[in-house]
């Protein structure tokens, strides 16, 4: 079954009931953006008796999800756009919390980490280009090989212009985030 909902919805029972009544699904993929939606959907799915495994987007990578949904998200599997356990991340979190008084791991940590990588990538390309000329920067970006970022080593694929990287797959096990696989996008 494939069902949709509107941004801002908080009651997903009608959609979930249609899915449940279809009886034709092995898992429930929650394509919601943030942990609050994922938590509400998980709670309501379990309330309606949906017992199939839950899959979600990277918005699930938040302690807030466990606070909202508790045992209802035990076993949920989701990908995150970047590695969230790497040297330097703890130091970044400490500095961020000291500066802003807020722990980004609650809801935006992967975006914060990738922003650090993007900044390092851009400043490195400007240095390598020796110029702020957009064409020179573009050429330097495309020539990037093995630049060690916060989350991964960055190398661009010359054919697709995508970054070679690995994507971690997580599962919530007994209220804890556990990395269960590191998927290589270019294997």
Name each model-derived stretch.
Residues 7, 185-187:
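A short acidic/small-residue loop/turn micro-motif
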Residues 11-14, 18, 36, 40, ...:
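Extracytoplasmic/secreted proteins, especially bacterial periplasmic and envelope-associated proteins
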Residues 20-23, 47-49, 68-72, 131-133, ...:
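Extracellular/periplasmic catalytic domains that process cell-envelope and extracellular macromolecules
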Residues 2-4, 76-78, 169:
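Conserved beta-strand scaffold positions in the cores of enzyme catalytic domains, especially
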Residues 99-112, 123-177:
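Segments of small-molecule ligand-sensing domains
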Residues 42-116, 127, 177-185:
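Extracellular/periplasmic periplasmic-binding protein-like sensory domains
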Residues 1-49, 84-91:
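Extracellular/periplasmic Venus flytrap/periplasmic-binding protein
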Residues 20-23, 29-32, 45-49, 80, ...:
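Sec/Tat-exported extracytoplasmic proteins
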């Amino acid at each position: 079954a494939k069902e949709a909902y509107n941004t801002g919805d908080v009651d997903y029972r009608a959609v979930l009931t249609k899915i449940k009544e279809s009886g034709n699904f092995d898992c429930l993929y929650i394509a919601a953006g943030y942990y609050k939606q994922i938590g509400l959907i998980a709670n309501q799915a379990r309330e309606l008796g949906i017992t199939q495994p839950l899959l979600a987007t990277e918005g699930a990578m938040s302690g807030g999800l466990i606070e909202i949904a508790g045992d209802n998200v035990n076993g949920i599997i989701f990908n995150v756009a970047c590695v969230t356990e790497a040297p330097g991340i703890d130091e970044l979190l400490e500095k961020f919390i000291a500066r802003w008084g807020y722990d980004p791991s609650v809801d935006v940590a992967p975006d914060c980490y990738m922003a650090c990588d993007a900044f390092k990538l851009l400043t490195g390309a400007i240095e390598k280009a020796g110029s702020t000329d957009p064409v020179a920067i573009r050429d330097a970006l495309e020539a990037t090989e093995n630049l060690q970022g916060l989350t991964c080593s960055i190398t661009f694929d010359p054919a697709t212009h995508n970054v070679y990287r690995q994507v971690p797959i997580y599962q919530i096990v007994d209220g804890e985030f556990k990395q269960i696989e590191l998927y290589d996008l270019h294997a």
